[in-house]
């Protein structure tokens, strides 16, 4: 039986999400702060996700994860309990679900290193959930994508996480985030002239 990688996909879904810098007010977006205000900016390099969609023909490797940063490619079996290789990716796929008639290969890549305090894990999760949402066929708002990504980290994986990283990755640009009751928050996007964007980009070194 051909593997998904050896067949022609029915469709290809591409999704990107920015990382975050300049988190003024960071840690006021957490459960222990309860309410707070954060200013941040979404910037390149993006987390990049590509999903190649195939008809499901009963193969065992129905879902294939290609984690390029780790040099790993493996089949995911959602019916088996636990998330053992890349829990964030596997839990996000479980949360979103897979239509019964589909198989897919998902490729994830980011130039931003993990652990750099730029919200890379949130960007990866937001990009992945945004791509998976297009399978069904794409009805989540940016706010809903952010909250779904946050729920994967906190409710499914029981990790500590504020809400600003996911909101920044889902909205992009310059954001003023006001959390009025964790995890509920409003996002006001700040519009600036292109000349200011270009100057910010010229001066930014990552």
Name each model-derived stretch:
Residues 2-15, 22-38, 74, 134-206:
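ATP-dependent small-molecule kinase catalytic core of the GHMP/sugar-kinase superfamily
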